Amino acid sequence: MDTTKTEEQFKRVMDECRTLFAKKLHDYGASWRILRPSSLTDQLFIKAKRIRSLEITGTSLVGEGIRPEFIALINYGIIGLIQLEKGCVDTVDIKPEEALALYDAHAKECLELMLRKNHDYNEAWRDMRISSYT
């Protein structure tokens, strides 16, 4: 099984997600460091519900589509992994460079896990309905 295409696609999407993460990090700093795991899982829930709503109704009154919500799911997921690793705090305690390094480390772990699972499951996810994720 050749997973070169999958790895390239993953990296392209992660570049897009990281770019947005870096922009928000520049604007707001690592303000998410104060969020508890329950706050982050609520954000993931809200994004998944919005995707489902857009899929079912086909209507967005705020003018944003589904793709930004999937990007948010990825970024909130990585933020969640960072928070689980470092714990939540009462004040921002990391600089943008450290936040990006943590982001990159977790994104790399996700890629490596995906490649291992792709081997074992023969990329079965490619045959799944996208709505299975929401």
Protein language model annotation of sequence segments:
Residues M1-T134:
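Intrinsically disordered, low-complexity regulatory regions
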